[in-house]
Amino acid sequence: TCALPILYQPKTMPAIVMVPAMRFVAVDGVGDPNEEGGDYAKAMQLLYGISFTVKMSKKSKNPAEHIGGYFDYTVPPLEGLWSMGEGVSGVDYAHKADFHWTSMIRLPEFVTDKIFAWAKASFAAKHPESDVNRAYLFDFDEGVVAQVMHEGPYDDEPATVAILDDYAR
């Protein structure tokens, strides 16, 4: 995150930035992210579990689990893509049960398909109740975007998004 402060420490005023292509662990779902024990909570367990499996691989006593090209890093913050479903513009905060989401955490460049498969299998062995097949590698190239830091409750996000939309037009 320190390597990309313009992305991970945005200002509270809208700005146009260039986002490079990045690799993520991602999980898709539908529903209210605030539902206790719901689908979103399960997705968070997968995302953070797999992310920290990669990060902590350096501490493994098993040489087969040591990752070539590994460098120590801070697990980046959670990111997400939100919609109300295909063909619907915007997000209706009054109908969170209808949210369609992709939640994701950026992974370091050294995470290959093989390393990702190992991380999923390793996490699944410790958490057999988790459906690791929901997690996938996602290469995302956003390019030029408008961004702003929202401060405050999630339910106040629509006002921040409206400011961002006006700026982007």
Q: Language model features by range: what are they?
A:
Residues L7:
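Basic, Lys/Arg-rich alpha-helical nucleic-acid-recognition elements, primarily the DNA-binding modules
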Residues K114-I163:
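A mid-sequence, solvent-exposed acidic-amphipathic segment
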Residues V30-E36, L107-V111, V144, E151-D156:
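A generic structural motif
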Residues C2-L4:
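Short, small-residue-biased leader/transition segments that mark boundaries at the very start
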Residues G38-V54, F123-A124, D156-R169:
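Long, well-ordered alpha-helical scaffolding segments within enzyme catalytic domains
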Residues P10-M18, D28-H100, M104-I105:
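Active-site loop/lid in soluble adenylation, ligation, and acyl-transfer enzymes
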Residues A15-V17, R23-D28, F138, V145-E151:
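Short amphipathic
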Residues F24, D98-T102, V132, V145:
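Broad gene-expression machinery/nucleic-acid interaction feature
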